[in-house]
Amino acid sequence: MLNNLEKQTREIVIDVVERSAIQPGNLFVLGLSSSEILGSRIGKQSSLEVGQIVVEVVLDELNKRGVHLAVQGCEHVNRALVVERHVAESKQLEIVNVVPNLHAGGSAQMAAFQLMSDPVEVEEVIAHAGLDIGDTAIGMHIKRVQIPLIPCQRELGGAHVTALASRPKLIGGARADYNMDIIRKS
């Protein structure tokens, strides 16, 4: 199963990033349950190896596009997120003090701490899009109005995969004109 994990993750990330219309400089949230990928219940079989594979692929694809990654932790760290320090500072995000482990923060946050150059935890973000691998509930960190994206693959290992993009609110009613919806073109 781990043999295909990198390839499948890359296909999903490319699909979601391209269809979300996310722009350079925007934030992208990753929620990940390595336990769910391995076929267990969320939080019951955390795997640093799985976290490293997924986060490395996501970071690689986002870095190519100039998009910033925010890795969501579990409820034991109040769903805080790991970002690069320069991102936290430039976006004026509230830095909090916690170092993730397998059972508080999770494998993806541990991997982000290893793979990012100057990682910090922040309390919350308002991201433009995100990927949820294993039903980790990333919606609280995606700006309104959220648009569900059905990824090209709905499962990664044993984990259910969903994604969210966002668009500006439509205001003004029947008399108003709107820009084209670039996420849902058809």
Curated annotation (Swiss-Prot):
Pfam families: DUF436. It comes from the Bacteria. Coiled coil: none annotated. InterPro entries: Antibiotic_NAT-like (IPR028345), DUF436 (IPR006340). Gene3D superfamilies: Hypothetical protein TT1679. Belongs to the UPF0340 family. This is UPF0340 protein SpyM50240. It comes from Streptococcus pyogenes serotype M5 (strain Manfredo).
